[in-house]
């Protein structure tokens, strides 16, 4: 096993690993075993629909599919007004898939770093916590994140026109 890259994470250690056969996977090592169990349960329930597939795991780690793509945050920060619509649609698709699986619950953290875009589809990568709520709450949390995210270009382009 060879570590190819370390991903940014506040609480956990997240690594891109190359196995002896050359295939890539992500190893997420959790600071807390309960968080690991929560995430494993969510990933197994989502079964690859809008999240990485589980390849294996242990007491405090999960090995999962590597979804090659770009961070939703990076796409958001570089998008022009026209691209914002397709980004919003892809995030909405994730929220709908999640809501179908976890009726009455939404992801606790909708930081755009927790999503990857691949071929126009949005995948979530942080499932340690979920909270009771509706799709409307998900959308409101995402809108708040987008509006309050601190950027250099006047705190983000205005995408709504009066």
Regions found by a protein language model. Name each.
Residues 44-51, 73-118, 122-123:
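Conserved kinase catalytic-core helix
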Residues 33, 70-71, 131:
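Feature marks short, surface-exposed loop/turn motifs that line or immediately flank catalytic pockets
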Residues 59-71:
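Conserved short submotifs of the Hanks-type protein kinase catalytic core
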Residues 113-141:
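Catalytic activation segment of kinase domains across protein kinase-like and atypical kinase folds
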Residues 139-162:
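Active-site activation/catalytic loop segments of kinase-like enzymes and analogous catalytic loops
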Residues 54-57:
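Conserved beta3 strand of the protein kinase N-lobe
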Residues 2-40, 44:
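ATP-binding glycine-rich loop module of kinase domains
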């Amino acid at each position: 096993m060879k570590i190819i890259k370390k991903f940014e994470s506040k609480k956990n250690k997240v690594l891109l690993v190359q196995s002896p056969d050359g295939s890539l996977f992500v190893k997420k090592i959790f600071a807390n075993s309960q968080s690991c169990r929560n995430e494993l349960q969510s990933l197994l329930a989502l079964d690859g629909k809008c999240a990485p597939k589980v390849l294996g795991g242990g007491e405090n780690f999960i090995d999962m599919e590597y979804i090659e793509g770009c961070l939703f945050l990076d796409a958001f920060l570089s998008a022009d007004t026209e691209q914002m619509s397709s980004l919003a649609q892809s995030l909405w698709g994730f929220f709908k898939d999640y809501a179908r699986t976890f009726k009455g619950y939404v992801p606790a953290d909708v930081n755009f770093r927790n999503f990857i875009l691949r071929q126009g589809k949005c995948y979530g990568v942080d499932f340690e916590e979920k909270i009771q709520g509706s799709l409307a709450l998900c959308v409101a949390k995402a809108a708040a994140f987008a509006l309050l995210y601190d950027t250099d270009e006047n705190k983000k382009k205005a995408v709504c026109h009066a």
